[in-house]
C-alpha cells in the first residue's frame, strides 16, 4: 500500500515556509491505519520487543495499537508535569530554548527490549530524548519506528547507532 497518498500536506503551517505532513488522514482510513500498524508490528516482532515506548502525543497514536496487537505493554514519554508518579527526566535543546521529557521511573525494567514509535522523524531531538530515558532505566532500544521520515532535516544522524524504520520518506 502506498501510504504517502493518505498523508495530507498543509502548506505554511504551523509557520510560513513549513509544509506540514499530517498523518491524521492515515488514521481517518481504517485500511491505511491498519496497514501502518501491521507493518510496524512485523518490524517489532523481528526484534523480540518486550515493551513499546512513545512520546506524546502522536507516539501514543502509533505505539498503542502496536503494543495492543503484540499483547505487550506501552510506556508513555510525556512533557514535564504530566505524569503522576515519580519520574526520570531528560532536558534537551530546541531551536529556541529547551524541552523536558519524562517517564515513570518504573516504566521500563532493566534488560527489557524496547521499540520506540513516533509519527515523524524530523530533527531527531524528541526521539533522542526518549532513547536517553529508556536507557537510563536500563532498557535496550532494539528498534525505532516512524510513519514518516523527513530526510532533508537529517534527524537520522542523532539516532544513527540504532535500527530505524520509516514507512514513508520525504527527500525535500
Curated annotation (Swiss-Prot):
The pathway where this protein functions is:
Purine metabolism; AMP biosynthesis via salvage pathway; AMP from adenine: step 1/1
Q: What is its main location?
A: cytoplasm
Keywords assigned by UniProt, alphabetized = Cytoplasm, Glycosyltransferase, Purine salvage, Transferase
Cellular component terms, GO, for this chain's entry? cytoplasm
The superkingdom listed in its UniProt entry is: Bacteria
Name of a matching Pfam family: Pribosyltran
- Asked if the Swiss-Prot or TrEMBL record annotates the protein with the keyword Protein biosynthesis, the reply is no
InterPro entries this protein is in? Ade_phspho_trans, PRibTrfase_dom, PRTase-like, UPRTase/APRTase
Q: Which reaction does it catalyse?
A: AMP + diphosphate = 5-phospho-alpha-D-ribose 1-diphosphate + adenine
Q: What class of enzyme is it?
A: transferase
- What molecular function terms (GO) are annotated for this protein? adenine binding; adenine phosphoribosyltransferase activity; AMP binding
Q: Which GO terms describe its biological process?
A: adenine salvage; AMP salvage; purine ribonucleoside salvage
Q: Subcellular location, in the record's words?
A: Cytoplasm
Enzyme Commission number, as recorded: 2.4.2.7
How is the subunit organization of this protein annotated in UniProt?
Answer: Homodimer.
**Which family does the entry's similarity section mention?**
Belongs to the purine/pyrimidine phosphoribosyltransferase family.
Free-text function comment from the UniProt entry: Catalyzes a salvage reaction resulting in the formation of AMP, that is energically less costly than de novo synthesis.
Protein's name according to its UniProt entry: Adenine phosphoribosyltransferase
